[in-house]
Amino acid sequence: MNVIGQEFQPIAAIATTPTAAKLLQPICQTLEATLWIPNFCQKTVNLSLNTQVYTDSLKNHLVNIWPDYNAIIFSLASGAVVRLISPLLQDKYHDPAVVVLDEAGKFVISLCSGHQGGADKLTNILAPLLNATPVITGASHNLELPGIDILGKPFGWQRGEGDWNKVSGIIARGETVQVLQEAGSILWQKHLPHQHPFYFGFPKIGEASPTPKARIWISFTQHQFSPDLDLPKVQWHPRVLWVGVGCERGTSKKLIATGIDKIFSTHHLAVRAIAGIATINIKADEIGLLEFCQEKELPLRTFSAELLNCVEVPNPSNIVAAEVGTTSVAEAAAILGAKQQQDINFQQGYNNNSSPIFEQGEIRDNKQESKLPLQGELQEEKKQLKFSTNLLVSKQIFRLEGEPGAMTIAVALAEKEYTGRTGKLLLIGTGPGQLDQMTSAAKTALSYADVVIGYSLYIDLIKPLFNPGQIVEKMPITQERQRGERAIELANFGLTVAVVSSGDCGIYGMAGLVLEQLRASCWDGKIPAVEIFPGISALQSAASRVGAPLMHDFCAISLSDLLTPWEVIEKRLIAAAMADFVVAIYNPKSQNRTEQLIKAVKIFLEYRQPENPVAVVRSAYRENEEITLTNLDKLLEVSVDMLTVILIGNQSTGIYNNWMITPRGYLG
């Protein structure tokens, strides 16, 4: 499945005319959506596998399909759509995303459920596919802020109680909002616009601070808000709490659920902050536990008695040790669950190192128990685990009258949240840098990403395409490896990460490096998911600015010897010159590399005539573009740098009225 649009599945698109159907068909193919058309359109529309016909009135048809889709795309007048859907609307937490396109494909309108349903995001995904204008009217979007009611969604946070409408209104007015964040990623804080209304933490003694008009709690604790207070509040709950459970065989789901609720209530912990359940491996088939995890969509991690016994706990039990081979189950499992969360680099699926994981109510086929350290490592592991994790609630015993079984519960706090999301890597080629030279698929992928990572120059060139709430990380030109590592880290966390390269990402770009790094990490080829979006390469861009120099066999050679020995580069230059290829030279010269181009020209002069045509193109399609047509013997007189591509023609290449032309048939 195409990774773009997965979160909206299933998606429906509705057309009422042949024109609308033809507009929607390629969109449906890209997003794997179902296209619904009326009966009379069958004769004029090429029916594909994802096209369905409705025979009733559209009003009645909508009643039937409304509950079945998470997003519905209409190509219809917006007023007509409003009248059609108004009887079906419940609230923003249950309604599907509703997006409207005009039949000309000029505008994409986020009509309903912009935040919770994702209509705003879907609008930004669709607009580049049509080269259309996205129409989003929400206040947070216009302020370039993430919607407060979807702020934690990329990180898997759970939305808690509070007056969300009032707080959203205060943010829309630009009034000061206090943010008290006790847990979870602070990435979002680092990527806010310069002018934002948030004030973080409490003021220091003697420090002047604005009076907040609202407050946002980001915490694993459960705050009780009085509705009478003048200061409206909301709360997000990062999933950082690991619940260790030990139980008798046959303990019921009801007892487990009631016990966890009671313990959390007693200690003022938020049930929504639960990351997962952890226990001993002999409980991997415990029906009550499995049913509870499935109902709550929580991962279940199991550990061997040997590993659990390595954990220093406050309440060890010799009785438990005699029964299952470890002095602690609940406390040790909670600590290990939390420790594993911060040590696994957030990898969803855990490389087959955990027991069945419930993802969206389904059991992932993952039968391996958590990987054990080697025997010689156990004592060192025990030393590390002593201080590794904060045990918030020590072992509590719980029974429930009328229910079979008994359980012990402990709760540990992980440093980093469990997102519950499968991360994605979108490797994007942005083309030469001018936005209209970027493919619509690449623009769509960029819009879909939670995070964008790239060289600072390339990031600046595509800045107009970024959306509010996106995390954008710039890095220097020499930090390609760090960019790749950072992207993989964030994707393993569960985020959708776009890694941008100029030109084509698979030609001297980041795609190869990222895939190399994934291979080195024993990537399973599935998690994180990877999709590559090609772009117009630098040699294509340069060629288009000077004519048609690549009409016969050609090759590309980089003169950078940072990763390739010069001896290898020299052999390739000789071979290309001897074979009379048209040659595109990348990375011809830098501040520290000045001799390579001189040597390359010398090699070509041994096999080509001095008057052999050469094009020198710097920053094609950018504001500071420079183009020079010259001859091989004059090439060293032209200023070049790392943003330059040099095109050396073959013996048949010529210059005609300042156009460089290589004949289709070889004449040399």
PLM segments and residue spans:
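Long, charge-dense
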Residues: K92-G147, I280, L289-V329, F533-L539, ...
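Conserved anion/nucleotide-ligand pocket segment
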Residues: L126, L130-H194, W566-P613
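A contiguous loop/helix-start segment that scaffolds small-molecule binding in enzyme catalytic cores
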Residues: G184-P210, F220, N318, L425-L427, ...
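C-terminal edge-of-domain segments
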Residues: P212-L229, Q235-W236, A333-D343, F387-K416, ...
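Glycine-biased, low-complexity coil/linker segments
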Residues: G349, G361, G376-E377
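Class I SAM-dependent methyltransferase SAM-binding "motif I" and its flanking Rossmann-like core
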Residues: G509-A579
